[in-house]
Design a protein with these regions (language model features):
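Basic, Lys/Arg-enriched alpha-helical interface segments
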Residues: 1-60, 79, 95-97, 101-104
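A generic local structural motif
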Residues: 49, 68-69
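Enriched for short, Lys/Arg-rich terminal
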Residues: 69-70, 74-104
């Protein structure tokens, strides 16, 4: 049975930042990338544990195949919340200081 899926304001902002950045060089590629990220995330409705366990307790990571992007999310009951979207080359804050990610 599908679960509810929501994007945090931070995740929405990060997706838009990614789209805007790629759009500087190639607007069509930016749209394709954003569409791909959203499509892969939508699979979490049916497979909420599709991603691997993350470094933070309770956080899961979904690698967007064919891109360097990783989606951080958490599952609570019948709800999946997308916390943020990272470029794989970005430096993450050390555990305990990841202010972007909710504590679960």
């Amino acid at each position: 049975m599908p679960v509810d899926l929501t994007w945090s304001p931070l995740a929405r902002a990060r997706l838009e930042e990614i789209r805007a950045y790629v759009s500087l060089d190639n607007p069509a590629a930016a749209e394709r990338l954003a569409t791909r990220i959203v499509a892969v995330v939508e699979a979490l409705r049916d497979y909420p544990y599709l991603g691997r366990a993350g470094a933070e307790p309770g956080i899961r990571e979904l690698v967007i195949g064919g891109t360097p992007h990783i989606v951080h999310y958490h599952v609570r009951g019948k709800r999946v919340t997308i916390n943020t979207v990272w470029h794989g080359a970005q430096r993450k804050e050390p555990p305990g200081r990841a202010r972007d990610l909710p504590r679960v």
